[in-house]
């Protein structure tokens, strides 16, 4: 009976831990992701969800997700493009010189 309970315990732990491990394996790499298609957001600028999928623009600003990035790019007079996926790095004045 002790063998059975240890086997059930191991299976229970596996069922709890497996989803946590497998979700990270499905995340797309920053290097393999393509630039967002801003034409998708053209008809509804600034009507964006609050999901976090950060984008760094060439203007050095971080945008929370592709919708906000594209809305700012298409709806403002500023000229900037897609830099990379993820937050922009903040540089100190000492690092720039």
Curated annotation (Swiss-Prot):
Q: Which cysteines are joined by disulfide bonds?
A: 38-70, 48-67, 56-88
| Name of the protein in its database record | Sperm-associated acrosin inhibitor
Q: Which Gene3D superfamilies match?
A: 3.30.60.30
What positions are marked as the site Reactive bond?
50-51
Biological role: Inhibits acrosin.
Q: Which GO terms describe its cellular component?
A: extracellular region
The terms under GO molecular function for this entry are: serine-type endopeptidase inhibitor activity
InterPro entries hit by this protein: Kazal_dom (IPR002350), Kazal_dom_sf (IPR036058)
UniProtKB keywords: Disulfide bond, Protease inhibitor, Secreted, Serine protease inhibitor, Signal
Its ancestry begins with: Eukaryota, Metazoa, Chordata, Craniata, Vertebrata
The highest taxon in the source lineage is Eukaryota
Compartments, as annotated in UniProt:
Secreted
Signal peptide feature range: 1-26
Source species of the chain: Sus scrofa (Pig)
């Amino acid at each position: 009976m002790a063998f059975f309970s240890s086997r059930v315990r191991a299976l229970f732990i596996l069922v709890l831990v497996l989803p946590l491990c497998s979700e990270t394996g499905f995340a797309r790499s920053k290097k393999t992701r393509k630039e967002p298609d801003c034409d998708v957001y053209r008809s509804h600028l600034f009507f964006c969800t609050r999901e976090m999928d950060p984008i760094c623009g060439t203007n050095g600003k971080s945008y929370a997700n592709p919708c906000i990035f594209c809305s700012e790019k298409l709806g403002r007079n500023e000229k900037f493009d897609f830099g990379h996926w993820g937050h922009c790095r903040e540089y100190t004045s000492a690092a720039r010189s």
